[in-house]
Amino acid sequence: MIQIYFGYGKGKTTSALGQGMRAKGAGKNVLLVQFLKNNKSSELAVLPFDIFKSPENLPFNPGKEYQAWVDSALSYIKNSTCDIIILDEFLDVIDTFVSLNDSLDLLNCLKDKEVIITGHKKIDKFFEKADYITHMEKV
C-alpha cells in the first residue's frame, strides 16, 4: 500500500509519523528516512523507529555529498526488513536527486510493504501508483 501526503499545507510529516506510531503500536517495524532535512528534529530522539539519519548539517544547496547520501539511503530502503517505510519529503528529491524512473523502481521494490511518502510536489506518474493521496493545503 502506498500513501502520499503532499502540498504546501502543514501536517504532512506529522501525519506520516502518526501512521508510523500506530503501526509500531500494532507490532510493526517502521523505517523513517527524511530527505532534505537535517537530523536535529526533536521527535527523532523519541521515535521508536529504525531511522536512516540525514546529514547533520544539510547545506542550503545540496550537491555531490548529498547525492551520495541519497544513493546510500535508497540502498538502505531497498534492503530494509521493516513493514512500514516512511519517506519524508521524498517527493521533493524526485527529478533532482532521484530520477522519476528510479523512484518508480523503488516503489516496485517495496510492493510488499506499506510506504508513506510526503513532500510538496505533485508528480502524476508517481501518484498513479498510490492507494491513498491526501492533499494538504494552506487556507
Question: Could you describe each region identified by the protein language model?
Answer:
Residues 13, 86, 130:
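Conserved RecA-like P-loop NTPase ATPase core
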Residues 84-85, 114:
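Hydrophobic "anchor" residues on beta-strands that sit immediately upstream
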Residues 7-8, 35, 88-90, 118-120:
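Fold-independent oxyanion-binding glycine-rich loops
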